[in-house]
Every structure is written in C-alpha cells, then in structure tokens.
C-alpha cells in the first residue's frame, strides 16, 4: 500500500530539466544544486537521477559526505564554504571543493597542514552583500590565496545574483560588470548564473551554471511557471481523502470556526497538515487537485489535516487521491496563493512525508 502523504519524485522530469538547462547554456558545465535535501526531493535520489551533471552544489559538508558515501564521484562544491579548520582534512580526503568568502577561512587555509591542496572557488561580493570579498578586498585576497600552498591552482571565481529573478531589474547587469571587470584575464573557472541567470541572463552563463530550483521544474520568477521553459515538475505531493461529509449552509468548519458555508455542500478532509510541512497560513481558496479539478481549501489547516470544499454535487469518495502540488497543479500557483515562494514549500516538508521515486 502506498504511504500517505507522499512526495513522488519523477526521475524523468529531473533528467528533462537538466537537459533543458544544458540547452539554455550549451557552452557551460552544470553544477546541479542539491542542497536542503535536494530541495526536499531527497539528496541521493536527485544526485542519482542527475548523474550526468558535471558537479553538485551543496550548502553543508555533511551533505557532501553523504553523496560521497552514496557513491557519487562528480565534483562537489560547498557553496557556503567550510566552517572549521577540522573540516579541511575532510575536504582533502573526499575531494570536495570549497567556496572561500571570508578572512577567517583564508587564515585557516594558511595555518593548516594538509596532505594536498584544496580546490577553492573565491566568492566575490558583486552586489548582494551577503557573502564574498568586496571589490576593494579582491586583489589582496586573491594574492594571499595564490601564495598559499594549501590552495590548488588555478583559483576558480564566482559570484551570486541578488535580483536575477526580476528579469527587468538592471542590477543583475551591474553585478555582471563588477565581477567581469575584477576577474578579467585571470585563470580558472567562472560561475555567476543561478537558475534565473541561466534562464533569463544568457550573458551570465560563464564556464559553469549553478541551477537549483529550475532543476526541480519550478520557475525562479514570481508569476512565471516552469512549464513556460519546458521544465517539468519533479515532485507530486499527494495525499488522500479520509472523510467526505455533507455540510449545511451556515455551519462552520475547523479550529476557530474560521469558515462558514454559504450554501449546502460536500466537504473533503485531506490527510496532510502543518505537521507535514503544508503551511498553516494557507488561506481560504488555496487550490487542491482532486479527481481532475481544483477545489478550494476552507477553514484552517491543522496539524494533520486540511479541509476542501468539494461542491454540492461532488461524487468523490474516501480514499481518493488529493494532489497538493505537482504536474496538474504547479507549486508556483500554490505558493502565490499562500504568499510565499515555491522554494519554501518544497524544502519544508517534514520527515512524516514519504519521499519516493515514482
């Protein structure tokens, strides 16, 4: 019997999305970003499905070690870099690249005793002002890393965009110019483009692109949909109806009696709630897909359940499946109703949701 709720992960969708991104950036290698448990899709699931990617980007060392333990041989890059000097021997032992973005990391590299050098991607703060060395610091930092025996040569170079998901925002062009002027004529790889860069800013594609959300079939741009780019949703979040009830006009439903029926109808109770990662703040009208149609959430989402208005003439039965988002109901649409972004929805599913390859 299939578990409920479950996140069905489509390997063919993941492979399609990688192919689409390769076509978009045909001169670039692809660093598939699989941080946050593969954006909620399962770290090893995604890496195995995307085994033809040229490398994988991760946030934490533990994620990289899990991939190595799972047999992944491709290039791995820690996008936040290492945090402790004791991380450095692990990077060497498991052949893991690291971003360097801060003085403390440079000092640890200079002071370490390592069996071989570490591959470093120096992050430039071209305008996001979160991580990275500033343009004023760049020459000095680059010289220090070049002089450090624990740093493999050449040093690779990267930056990250603040507003690439706003295609009309000129700031991305400013960031590209800043980065390109600083790094002109230096050896090594360059990477600028995230998903939005790969899809909307072709001049940013560089030697490597670093797509994340687009690999999972989701557009990074609010109001857009992955399908507009040939992307296919990789996750179907599925549960089922555990009750179908006749409901009279004037009767409330759920905690706080938040919603009251304006007419006689039939309600369905779906076995998923905020304990599974479905947002408690999903408002009335947020769509759920049941038997080929959108039906609205009514009342408050509770820990284990939510309620939908099936309509007065509904013939839905207990046990029928309900799709919370996926191929028939884009996660971008659900996120817009809730007032969040698709990234948050797919990454916040809890361990109660079974993640399985479909």
From Swiss-Prot:
Entry GO MF terms: alanine racemase activity; pyridoxal phosphate binding
Gene3D superfamilies in alphabetical order: Alanine racemase (3.20.20.10), Lyase, Ornithine Decarboxylase, Chain A, domain 1 (2.40.37.10)
The protein's Enzyme Commission number: 5.1.1.1
SUPFAM superfamilies given in the database record: Alanine racemase C-terminal domain-like, PLP-binding barrel
Cellular component terms per the entry's GO annotation: cytosol
HAMAP family: Ala_racemase (MF_01201)
Family, similarity comment: Belongs to the alanine racemase family.
Name of the protein described by the UniProt record: Alanine racemase
Organism listed in the record: Shewanella sp. (strain MR-4)
